[in-house]
Amino acid sequence: MVTQVGINGFGRIGRIVLRASLSNPEVQVVAINDPFIPLEYMVYMFKYDSVHGRFQGTVEAKDGKLVVNGKEISVFSERDPAQIPWGSVEAAYVVESTGVFTSIDAASAHLQGGAKKVIISAPSGDAPMFVCGVNLEKYTSDLKVISNASCTTNCLAPLAKVINDNFGIVEGLMTTVHATTATQKTVDGPSNKDWRGGRGAGANIIPSSTGAAKAVGKVIPELNGKLTGMAFRVPTPDVSVVDLTVRLEKGATYEEIKAVIKKASENELKGILGYTNDQVVSTDFVGDAQSSIFDAAAGIALNDKFVKLVSWYDNEFGYSNRVIDLLAYAAKVDAAAQ
């Protein structure tokens, strides 16, 4: 069964979700909506990418449609999600990747146009959040709007789950050293809600807030209230790294911690949580489809109950692959429930 998908918002995540969908035979993107990007420009934006390189397939505009690898994708340009005719192209599942419609109420507008399910590619204040490898078993087919959480939560949660399951986490602090994103300014500019966030992205390390660590408590209830965190935005275009410092319930050597993470990466979390012993740097992970790659050589332990763990993630590509994985999983559960 191939699940037909619509994408609302053809920005960084929307475009990379389309790229990711091409390597999953269970999913086919049949429509894209973006009121700000004309069709010819869509072709250009999809073909060329400063981070992920030139698209290694064919892309063209033909008869008002975007044609990728010979397959036609309908293009809409509605500003109001309720007006997008998803039903006319049988796009049952919609990826909401504008970054604007992130609540259940706002994202539900897609249902009026014929969509059956909406996956928000961002954290949500009220939509249930799912992280592949962590809490997918809690998904039920009656849910109409769900969230794939954030790229940072997708990196942190699998690591936190392994540590908590094996040793117990008493409490912890997370810092993500995070690549620049589209909401930042190229040079100093106005940003009333976040003064630091208005400073030039290319010239600064910018302290910022993130709800990623607290969100782990929503997908792993046992960790609710035990983790919080912050971010440093840095002048790199892609790939971020989580620094998780935790106090453990059960003492363990760093070697023992590495062993359980390696085991999980080869078994139940294969493809989600990676493991490396190499002397890696951020660009080594551009295009890595995993949610989180544990850097065994970078972590440190003060004693057997207080450790710092380091894990990398391609905040664009890894996350976009999980959006597709979550969607495909939901479609299977929904089909079985019918």
Swiss-Prot record:
Entries under Pfam families matching the protein: Gp_dh_C (PF02800), Gp_dh_N (PF00044)
GO cellular component, one term: cytosol
Pathway: Carbohydrate degradation; glycolysis; pyruvate from D-glyceraldehyde 3-phosphate: step 1/5
Residues binding D-glyceraldehyde 3-phosphate, per UniProt: S150, C151, T152, T181, T210, G211, R233
Residues forming the catalytic site: C151 (nucleophile)
UniProt GO BP: glucose metabolic process; glycolytic process
Binding site for NAD(+): R12, I13, D34, R79, N315
EC number: 1.2.1.12
Subcellular location as annotated: Cytoplasm
Record-annotated site: Activates thiol group during catalysis: H178
Key words, A-Z: Cytoplasm, Glycolysis, NAD, Oxidoreductase
Keyword Transmembrane helix: no
GO MF term set: glyceraldehyde-3-phosphate dehydrogenase (NAD+) (phosphorylating) activity; NAD binding; NADP binding
Gene3D superfamilies, A to Z: Dihydrodipicolinate Reductase, domain 2 (3.30.360.10), NAD(P)-binding Rossmann-like Domain (3.40.50.720)
Catalyzed chemical reaction(s): D-glyceraldehyde 3-phosphate + phosphate + NAD(+) = (2R)-3-phospho-glyceroyl phosphate + NADH + H(+)
Keyword flag Signal: no
InterPro entries reported for this sequence: GlycerAld/Erythrose_P_DH, GlycerAld_3-P_DH_AS, GlycerAld_3-P_DH_cat, GlycerAld_3-P_DH_NAD(P)-bd, Glyceraldehyde-3-P_DH_1, NAD(P)-bd_dom_sf
Family: Belongs to the glyceraldehyde-3-phosphate dehydrogenase family.
PANTHER family: GLYCERALDEHYDE 3-PHOSPHATE DEHYDROGENASE (PTHR10836), GLYCERALDEHYDE-3-PHOSPHATE DEHYDROGENASE-RELATED (PTHR10836:SF76)
Subunit description: Homotetramer.
Name this polypeptide is given: Glyceraldehyde-3-phosphate dehydrogenase 2
Organism for this UniProt entry: Mucor circinelloides f. lusitanicus (Mucor racemosus var. lusitanicus)
